[in-house]
Amino acid sequence: IFKEKKWMNYSSKKAQILNVLSWSAKDWIDTYYFDESGFSLDSNIPYYWSPIGKPVEIPSNRFAKRINVLGFLNTKNNHLFSKTTITKVNTQVVIDFFNDFVNQITKTTVVILDNASIHTSKLFKAEIEKWEKLGLQLLFLPPYSPELNKIEILWKHMKYHYHKLEAYLSFDNLHKHVKNLLAGFGTNYDINFK
């Protein structure tokens, strides 16, 4: 249904997204936002309060291992379909995750995503027709518009609001913490996307 030129202007694309969201509000379709993000021991926390005389120190871990997260987020019901990996995220990893996702949809589903090269590669594009036959439609955002991808808000909250300092003490702690945040989203952790 979204066969028009990929590079619509910002306001036209935003109107198209609002139209899709109105269909979702009527339960005609499901709408999800897709993106990837990464977490490492190189802390995103800009400052931390500690008692006087007891400074909290986090060792610098430049070039630390990274936990990559892929996620589909439905902001209507806060359903999050996600996966973590410590491997590099490439087109094939994204395709495999899309295949997992499409196998669990129950009605026509629109996925809103950015134009990252792994989403626009020949390998990725070769899968689109198969996904469309299974009820999955892709709606690409205009360039440089992360504010239209609501899952970016979740990544921001995970990095800057929900993190506990103890998560940065070891890679295992961080991995467990990221998994707990993802598993607890919608129950223990909530965001009002409106």
Predicted regions located by residue number:
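Short functional hotspots at interaction and active-site rims
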Residues: 1-194
